[in-house]
Amino acid sequence: MFDPKAIQNDFPMFRNKPDMQGRPLVWLDNASTTFKSDSVISAVVDYYTKETSNSHRGDYDLCYEMDQAVLHARKTIARFLNCEPREVVFTSGATGSLNTVAYGYGLKFLKEGDEILITEAEHASNVLPWFQIAKYTGCKVSYIPLSENGRITPKNLEKALTPRTKLVSFAAVGNVLGYLEPVKELTKIAHNHGVLVCLDGAQSVPHMKTDVRDLDVDFLAFSGHKMLGPTGIGVLYGKYDLLSKMDPFISGGGNNDKFHMDCSVTFLPPPERFEAGTQNLAGILGLTKAVEYLENLGFDSIVEHERKLKQYAVEKLLQTGNAEIYNADSEAGIITFNIKGVFAQDAATYLNSQGIACRSGQHCAKLLNQTYLKTPATVRASFYVYTTEDDIDALAEAVKNGGNYLDAYFI
């Protein structure tokens, strides 16, 4: 049986920070970052206390052992995604991964007149790199229209594609609305038009089984810290033939075979081509443990747990009479809402006073607020494997009381 209360015992944050503002801590900002398990923390601490070495840069036992540990990590991630180890590139996070695609592929292959398709719901990490590439190359950024409830539909993608479209980039699950997009169907449509697909998996990979072979996406980006792993580590998956054609986003030690005074350089094959400099080795080891932890819980159980929590949370918030919910029907464990008549940041500040950590603002998705939501800011509560119904009850109680409290305070 999936028991989030028992799962909390594996996370020292719940032991070491049991309260906030004098009230029991309710952590509902998991779409931003997640707590780390004992196993993840131990892996990071062990690197700094027992295993410190560089990788691929020494002829001694510690370095050899680190080489093997990184190889094991790469194989673990490859098995996790159902791809080849050579298609797994370690990066600083989803932002680093998306920029690697934008600059490594887009800057090299896109030209004036070409088109990139994104949506208005994208996180800034999947918008601004493409804006930059458009500025540098003269290509154009266009948008797939969202449906009335904020989804990407196959029909709308089909309409948005043109003979000029070269690449489509979108999130499998949006970080604001939380809709699970039909990735496989969308990818097939794009490929039928000869268009590449770059998938932002920051909000999907931590929560559901991801099979890149089945989805057939060309690129996938995700972060470790959103899936119980350390900060500063992420992954870029890319089909090997595409990675082989790309230039590195960052150059330096460890990503080249040779270079000469005439400025000529021969880069190593992927993935090393994209891993210049000393990597976040502690992060790589910690991410491996996070993947193993999630696999041990089972993604079917995680999906079902979050589905039930989402349904429960929607019901409880609507019962308060104070909540305006913008994504009640979305699949992910994300609820974006406002307390009626209260500015989002004021609401989040009040929730903080009740020991509840939620996110407020535009959630790095400024285009969505300007177009679809048509509101300056929202509050976002997001769930994960250790979130309980008690956490939802605390949120609902605060929303119920907060509307009246804040009305009295500001009026």
Regions of interest found by a model, annotated:
Residues M1-I411:
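Pyridoxal 5′-phosphate
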